[in-house]
Design a protein with these regions (language model features):
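Short functional hotspots at interaction and active-site rims
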Residues: 1-175
Length: 175
């Protein structure tokens, strides 16, 4: 994050009053979430216990039960403990009878409702979270874009390098 903070300072000093557009590839480092991010697979089935506290959220407008759409949802209990999967899903109006907390090893690829963690992890507020990088750039008043995943040889910087490689011989004097 130090590098991007420095890049923002340099840009703002060089171009006062302008807005930068920072473009990144799909590196896992660029997608790092903050410590209080919403992560269903790190939650217990029940409230409390050894699980980290997660940030409060707003129940998405895509929530299956329209009665709860747009409502704020605290991710801690009245006593300050982290809420479990069961409580969070019940507050959203999900019927979770018969579902286990998590699949034993890995959730089946085709399944969307195999366990509580999978069900919650597919909710819009859990899926669409801003990375630390994105938040930092937006808070500074700039734009942040992520390129779609592609093969490394199709990376735009590779295209520029190839273009320069092709053009260089025609512009270099051999005398």
């Amino acid at each position: 994050m130090t590098q991007i903070k420095d890049a923002i300072k340099i840009f703002e000093a060089s171009h006062p009053g302008c807005q930068a557009v920072f473009i990144f590839d799909q590196s896992s480092a660029h997608a790092s979430l903050p410590p209080d991010a919403l992560r269903a697979f790190e939650m217990n089935k029940s409230d409390g216990g050894k699980q980290r506290k997660q940030r409060d959220t707003v129940i998405p407008m895509s929530n299956p039960d329209p009665r709860f759409r747009g409502h704020p949802q605290k991710m801690t209990t009245v006593s300050g403990e982290a809420k479990g999967l069961k409580a969070v899903l019940e507050e959203r109006g999900f019927n979770i009878k018969g579902l286990k907390a998590k699949c034993s090893l890995v959730c089946p690829f085709e399944s969307q409702k195999c366990c509580l963690a999978r069900l919650l992890s597919q909710q819009e507020d859990f899926v669409n979270q801003e990375s630390i990088l994105e938040t930092l750039i937006k808070e500074a008043g700039h734009k942040c874009l992520f390129l779609p995943k592609f093969h490394c040889e199709l990376n735009p910087i590779e295209m520029v390098s190839l273009h320069n490689y092709i053009l260089t011989p025609s512009h270099v004097s051999t005398t």
